[in-house]
Amino acid sequence: MARSCKILAKLPRVGTAISNLTNVCEEMRRHIVLATQETAPLFEEAAILMSQQQEVETKEKILDAFNNHFILSEDELSSLTSSAKPVDDLFFDALARMKQIHKDCEVLLGSENQRLGLDIMEQSSKNLNGAFQKLYKWIQKEFKSLNLEDPQISLSIRRALRVLAERPSLFHNCLDSFADAREYTLSDSFHTALTDVPSGQERDMAARPIEFSAHDPLRYVGDMLAWVHSAAVSEREALEALFIGDEGEIAKGIQAGVNNEPWSRVDGEEIVFDGPKALNDLVTRDLNGVTRSLRQRVELVLQGNEDSIVIYKIIGLLAFYENTFSKLLGRESGLVTSVASLQEFAFKHFQILMQDQLAVVSAEPANLTPPADLSTPQFLHDALDNLTSLMKAYDSSFAHEHANDSSGENKFSPIIREALDPFLELAKTSSNDISDPTSRAVFHVNCLLSTRDAISPYPFVCVTHLPQLTNTLKTLRTTLLEIQHEFLLNASGLHILLTALKPFTPPATATLEPTRSSYPPDLATISSLPEFQPQTLSSISQQLDDFLPSALVDVTENLKAIHSPVLVKSVTEEAVEAFCTDFEFVEGMILGADEARGKLVVHGDGEDVGAEEAGEGEGEEPQADNWRLRSLFPRTTGEIRVLLS
């Protein structure tokens, strides 16, 4: 109870304390409200500032990223455009960044702020142009001291060339300068090789200037061509390492440059860079000076030489190197064209030499007079000797080939037409001046036989000329056969009887219904012919008997001037056979005539006796018409064959 009283006594004080606390809270609330009212603008401003700070920070990051991507540092710009700075890795890195910046400007041009993109693109274009100009000048400077013979060509210049290829105009200008420099260098080296002994401690003491062999045209031309070939191979290998290596990076650069410069295309055609062709063109340009000097010297050598064999060997040498240079540099190369034109020049000179030789022979009548023994004339012998040397040279040369078409034409065909055909024609003309047909045919045959013997070992000549020679020889052989046959008939007197018996010769063709006047005529009339009168027939028979013992020797002697015993023997044998056939015909006509006159009776023992006696007694004279042709012309075909065998 007492405790309750104490609690009740303290309640007023608790109420007072609570009231005071309430007042304090109210006061504090009032102060808080006032403070809140006073600080609210500050908080709002702070929030705005914080938001702005975030925006600024974001923009700062964007700006930093933009600057890092689109803006080069001062060092990079200086390395890119300053001529005082070297072309090193920093330059190429800066150039790569600048090209990327220029490409990425396309993104800016697609945004709302195109002005920024245009400004940056304009500035990057200026920087790129300055960088490529710096690179172009640096490459030209390096080219002046570049040693292509050094197997370790600077990697930096190879890298620079690949980068410069993205500017085709600058790249080609650079190549022009390079080609001019190399042309001068190679021309100077060629002149040195021609006239000066190589210097240096390790020089070959046996080495001599090329012009030391100028007295030997073939070696002189060969040494010059060999030097040019060696220089072309070395130049191509060096330039291939310089321009074509690294998997065609230069080609890719040029293609990229062409794609970036569509206005440089002709008629809108797609331009594709051909690396090997460009390399061949560059090597050709480098050798232009050497090519001109080579052409001049070879032409002088050709003009000053009158040996057709040497000229032809030079033609073969030029043909070999034309093929070699074609494989190395392509058919369109100026060097190949020059060597081909030198071949044409040499062949024209060869033609002139052949024409001069022909003119010299034709100008002297004694040269055209056939020899007394009807042998091959000296001018044709000389021409065949010359041709043999030419054929041997071709047979052992690189140009030797099989016939390239159905006509058998080959690379030697133009040569033989100049070196042989005119002289054969001249020999034929000379033979036409011989009045005697036999001598004319023998002389012509000897000329053709000598020609055939000369060309027979060489198939590439036989294929074009042997058929014609063979046909002509066949024609002449027929002529010789007729001559030998005619000789046998004339020498034996048999031609008189054959001429008289011509009406009794069987016709080549017979009509289906022969008339009384047609073949065969009455054989009994043969004895009335003047040629078959006793005195004439006996004279012819005696002439035949006088001729037969030496007939074979005489008829062979008729063609003794021919240089082919085999030909003489075969022609004579055929002529003898034809003579025997003619004699057999005459013999048959004589027997037929005697039988037709009733003057020949053939007994069982084979001996011929008269059907009528000349008279009743032995001492009586025969009647004028009681004679037999057979008794006046007793030779038989069998006897003739034996005597002429």
Swiss-Prot record:
Where it sits in the cell: the answer is: Golgi apparatus membrane
What is one GO cellular-component annotation here?
Golgi transport complex
Role played: Acts as a component of the peripheral membrane COG complex that is involved in intra-Golgi protein trafficking. COG is located at the cis-Golgi, and regulates tethering of retrograde intra-Golgi vesicles and possibly a number of other membrane trafficking events.
Is the Secreted keyword given for this protein? Answer: no
| Designated gene of the protein | COG6
Per UniProt, which keywords does this protein have? Golgi apparatus, Membrane, Protein transport, Transport
* Species name: Ajellomyces capsulatus (strain NAm1 / WU24) (Darling's disease fungus)
**Principal cellular location given in the protein's record:** Golgi
> Which segments does the entry list as coiled coil?
none
Pfam families, per database record: COG6_C, COG6_N
Bilayer topology term: Peripheral membrane protein
Q: Which domain of life is it from?
A: Eukaryota
The organism's lineage is: Eukaryota, Fungi, Dikarya, Ascomycota, Pezizomycotina
The intrachain disulfides are none
Annotated protein name in UniProt: Conserved oligomeric Golgi complex subunit 6
Q: Which GO terms describe its biological process?
A: intra-Golgi vesicle-mediated transport; protein transport
Stated family = Belongs to the COG6 family.
